[in-house]
């Protein structure tokens, strides 16, 4: 049973502790949500209310104490007066006279509550309005014995106490009755306290609490009045000003206030309306300017990127998107370094940081930096990047950086090919010139010691080298002529004659290399629209190219046949619905797929990759240019180590 009660007590204490904790947490949360201004106001109000309540309490308490002191003095005087009058009567032991005097004195003084007279032995001699037995029950004799034991009666000094044993507060005064240092008795008189003192303590508390509550009520009412009449419109105005400052010009205040506050609200709404119209005009103007800028940037051949001072992308054109493979990505507002290739970031990011640092730490000046970036990892590309700072010219503050990206990959490759071409041509020209000079000098210096067969052999070699030199020079001249704007007259041409002439020209060369050179021409092949000499040059270059890359015992076939024209242009004269296709095929070393895309570039030689054959690298470029002059394209099908097949189509000349 005892254990069960202890368990109940512990459960109750635990529940009470949980409840108190929850209340405290709610109070802490509520207090944390209160603003600092409200906290300060509450603390100030609390301090003022406590101060005013304390002052009120102190003032009323002082008045109460002063009143009590006056009552005590009155009681002392009254008791001394009574003691002086009853001492002779008590000395004469005249009980009846004592009774009459005390009764008369009691009845004539309304403030007296009771009168007790003790004899020298401490026994009640007379009492009013209580009987002796009742008085003994209400009052103890300790005070009287104190007088007797400590001889206080010699001083005739009254003892004043407050007696609460009766209903109401009574000032209890004890005075020794003595004459000539002889104790005759003791007078105990009870005087009713001032009625105001009875209620003054409660009044003091009530007034202090009322002052405290009144101050809080005044503050609360003042705050409520202030909130509804002043604070609310001011708060609305403050919110409106903040929204206006943040760019929300649609903010309006709709409060029914008159006077100066109403005029202020009206002027605020009018200002917001004007700002809204001004913003709309600016937005339209900015939109128009932005559209113009975007149109201008999009038409620039180079890549263009505009960054803000935090390196976030503001504007990027199509060329830059294609250069960096950003198709389908929305990079506007993103940091540029998150989207650039790693190679570019490593070279570009330090420079961008340096530009921003210098413009923040030093006086901002407009500057342009140029860097060349080469990509080597996934694909080889070369970019020329121009970085130009964009400044606010009024305050010389950095606003952003403009990046111009030029793809110089093709130029670099052409430059490399050109350098290779110069190296090849210089080598190819130097070799025949050296051979020609060597053999001519030998003939000149040793012609007497050489027989006719040796002289003829030297002259034949010199003649061969001269032809080789002539071909090199002609290749360069032909390419320059073909790349110019010179117009060539296209007329009906006998393609069969051109093919047969080419075969006759290179039949001996093919025989020397043990290569079979065949032709396969469709019977009754129609004439084509072209330039006979240029067609001869096409066939010669392609046949020479095949001879160069075909192993001994190989085969070269030159075909010509009619094919349907899938892109017939019936409105153009000299055209019909068919074309003649020319093919030059071999079973030589073939061309890799990678090189097939580059084989028609100027100065590029397939021997750059095999390092066994000679040439300038202009033959196929010349072929491509000639075929383009004939409004056609050259195509290539090749497999490495299996051979190659070049083919192109020529338009059939219309019969007049």
Swiss-Prot record:
Keyword flag Nucleotide-binding: yes
Major enzyme class: transferase
Membrane-topology descriptor: Multi-pass membrane protein
One GO BP: regulation of DNA-templated transcription
Keywords assigned: ATP-binding, Chloroplast, Kinase, Membrane, Nucleotide-binding, Phosphoprotein, Plastid, Transferase, Transmembrane, Transmembrane helix, Two-component regulatory system
EC number: 2.7.13.3
Residue stretches making up the PAS domain: 289-359
Subcellular localization(s) per the UniProt record: Plastid, Chloroplast membrane
Domain Histidine kinase positions: 424-654
Transmembrane segments: 7-27, 40-60, 210-230
GO MF terms held by the record: ATP binding; phosphorelay response regulator activity; phosphorelay sensor kinase activity; protein kinase activator activity
Modified residues (Phosphohistidine): 427
Pfam families xref list: HAMP (PF00672), HATPase_c (PF02518), HisKA (PF00512), PAS (PF00989)
InterPro entries in the cross-refs: HAMP_dom, HATPase_C_sf, His_kinase_dom, HisK_dim/P_dom, HisK_dim/P_sf, Light-responsive_reg, PAS, PAS-like_dom_sf
Gene3D superfamilies: 1.10.287.130, 6.10.340.10, Histidine kinase-like ATPase, C-terminal domain (3.30.565.10), PAS domain (3.30.450.20)
One cellular component term from this protein's GO annotations in UniProt: chloroplast membrane
Domain HAMP: 231-280
Chemical reaction(s) catalysed: ATP + protein L-histidine = ADP + protein N-phospho-L-histidine
PANTHER family reported in the protein's UniProt record: SENSOR HISTIDINE KINASE GLRK, TWO-COMPONENT HISTIDINE KINASE
Protein name as catalogued: Uncharacterized sensor-like histidine kinase ycf26
Phylogenetic classification of the source organism: Eukaryota, Rhodophyta, Bangiophyceae, Bangiales, Bangiaceae
Protein's gene: ycf26
């Amino acid at each position: 049973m005892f254990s069960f009660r202890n368990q109940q007590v512990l459960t109750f204490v635990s529940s009470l502790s949980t409840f108190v904790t929850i209340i405290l947490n709610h109070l802490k949360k509520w207090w944390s949500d209160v603003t600092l201004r409200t906290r300060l106001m509450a603390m100030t109000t609390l301090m003022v209310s406590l101060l005013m309540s304390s002052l009120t309490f102190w003032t009323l308490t002082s008045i109460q104490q002063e009143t009590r002191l006056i009552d005590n003095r009155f009681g002392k005087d009254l008791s001394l007066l009574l003691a002086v009058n009853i001492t002779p009567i008590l000395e004469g032991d005249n009980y009846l006279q004592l009774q009459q005097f005390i009764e008369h004195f009691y009845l004539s003084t309304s403030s007296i509550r009771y009168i007790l007279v003790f004899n020298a032995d401490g026994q009640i001699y007379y009492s009013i309005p209580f009987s002796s037995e009742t008085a003994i029950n209400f009052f103890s004799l300790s005070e009287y014995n104190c007088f007797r034991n400590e001889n206080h009666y010699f001083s005739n000094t009254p003892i004043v106490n407050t007696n609460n044993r009766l209903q109401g507060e009574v000032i209890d005064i004890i005075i020794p009755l003595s004459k000539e240092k002889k104790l005759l008795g003791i007078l105990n008189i009870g005087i009713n306290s001032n009625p105001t003192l009875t209620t003054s303590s409660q009044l003091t508390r009530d007034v202090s609490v009322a002052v405290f509550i009144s101050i809080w009520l005044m503050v609360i009412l003042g705050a409520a009045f202030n909130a509804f009449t002043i604070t609310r419109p001011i708060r609305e105005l403050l919110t409106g000003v903040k929204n206006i400052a943040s760019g929300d010009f649609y903010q309006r205040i709709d409060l029914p206030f008159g006077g100066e506050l109403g005029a202020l609200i009206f002027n605020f709404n009018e200002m917001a309306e004007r700002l809204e119209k001004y913003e709309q005009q600016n937005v339209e103007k900015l939109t128009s300017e932005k559209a113009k800028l975007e149109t201008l940037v999009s038409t620039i051949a180079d890549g263009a990127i505009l960054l803000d001072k935090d390196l976030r992308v503001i504007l990027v054109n199509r060329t830059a998107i294609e250069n960096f493979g950003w198709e389908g990505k929305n990079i506007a507002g993103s940091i540029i370094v998150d989207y650039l290739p790693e190679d570019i970031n490593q070279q570009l990011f330090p420079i961008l940081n340096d530009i921003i640092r210098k413009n923040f730490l030093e006086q901002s000046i407009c500057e342009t930096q140029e860097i060349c970036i080469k990509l080597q990892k996934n694909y080889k590309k070369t970019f020329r990047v121009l970085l130009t700072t964009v400044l606010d010219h009024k305050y010389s503050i950095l606003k952003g950086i403009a990046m111009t990206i030029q793809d110089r990959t093709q130029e670099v490759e052409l430059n490399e090919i050109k350098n290779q071409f110069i190296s090849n041509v210089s080598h190819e020209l130097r070799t025949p010139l050296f051979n020609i000079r060597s053999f001519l000098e030998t003939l000149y210096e040793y012609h007497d010691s050489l027989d006719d067969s040796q002289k003829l052999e030297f002259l034949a070699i010199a003649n061969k080298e001269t032809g080789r030199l002539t071909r090199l020079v002609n290749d360069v001249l032909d390419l320059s002529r073909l790349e110019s704007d010179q117009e060539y007259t296209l007329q009906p041409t006998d393609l069969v004659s051109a093919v047969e002439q080419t075969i006759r020209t290179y039949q001996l060369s093919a025989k020397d290399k043990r290569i079979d050179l065949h032709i396969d021409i469709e019977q009754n092949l129609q004439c084509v629209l072209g330039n006979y000499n240029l067609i001869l040059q096409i066939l010669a270059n392609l046949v020479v190219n095949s001879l160069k890359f075909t192993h001994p015992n190989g085969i070269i076939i030159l075909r010509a046949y009619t094919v349907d024209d899938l892109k017939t242009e019936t409105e153009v004269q000299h055209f019909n619905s068919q074309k003649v296709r020319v093919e030059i095929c071999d079973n030589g070393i073939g061309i890799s797929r990678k090189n097939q895309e580059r084989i028609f570039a100027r100065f590029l030689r397939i021997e750059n990759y095999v390092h066994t054959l000679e040439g300038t690298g202009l033959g196929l470029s010349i072929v491509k240019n000639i075929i383009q002059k004939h409004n056609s394209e050259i195509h290539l099908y090749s497999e490495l180590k299996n051979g190659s097949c070049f083919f192109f189509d020529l338009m059939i000349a219309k019969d007049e």
